[in-house]
Swiss-Prot record:
Its EC number is 5.6.1.7. This is Chaperonin GroEL. One of its GO terms (biological process) is protein refolding. GO terms for cellular component: cytoplasm. Disulfide bonds: none annotated. Its main location: cytoplasm. It is an enzyme of class 5 (isomerase). Forms a cylinder of 14 subunits composed of two heptameric rings stacked back-to-back. Interacts with the co-chaperonin GroES. It catalyses: ATP + H2O + a folded polypeptide = ADP + phosphate + an unfolded polypeptide. GO terms for molecular function: ATP binding; ATP-dependent protein folding chaperone; isomerase activity. Belongs to the chaperonin (HSP60) family.
Length: 120
């Protein structure tokens, strides 16, 4: 039963990460999978599941606060292009995303669709 719960948890983590951030699902899935695996191993060795849960919650709070403290605002078109280029693994795509964001503004919506037409 724990394995099924773990699989559902990992699936939910990936979905929520995609919904909230649109990126990072692989990292979130790997982290969730490791948490489930090590959690099950510790429970099997006699650890208290509620104690593990509390420890994980404290760790999440610490990691979240550390990440938020080190986060930097991405404001300029150049910063957007650099960040998007790193995320996409292609600076040309980063430049296109920055250009699109420049046109629609911070509250605008950009929809990207796959095309079968080369070059478009």
């Amino acid at each position: 039963p724990y394995e099924k719960i773990g699989a559902e948890l990992v699936k939910e983590v990936a979905k929520k990460t995609d919904d909230v951030a649109g990126d990072g699902t692989t990292t979130a899935t790997v982290l969730a999978q490791a948490l489930v695996r090590e959690g099950l191993r510790n429970v099997a060795a006699g650890a208290n599941p509620l104690g593990l849960k509390r420890g994980i919650e404290k760790a999440v709070e610490k990691v979240s606060s550390t990440l938020l403290a080190s986060a930097k605002e991405v404001e300029t078109k150049e910063q957007i292009a650099a960040t998007a280029g790193i995320s996409a693994g292609d600076q040309t795509i980063g430049d296109l995303i920055a250009e699109a964001m420049d046109k629609v503004g911070n509250e605008g919506v950009i929809t990207v669709e796959e095309s079968n037409t080369f070059g478009l």
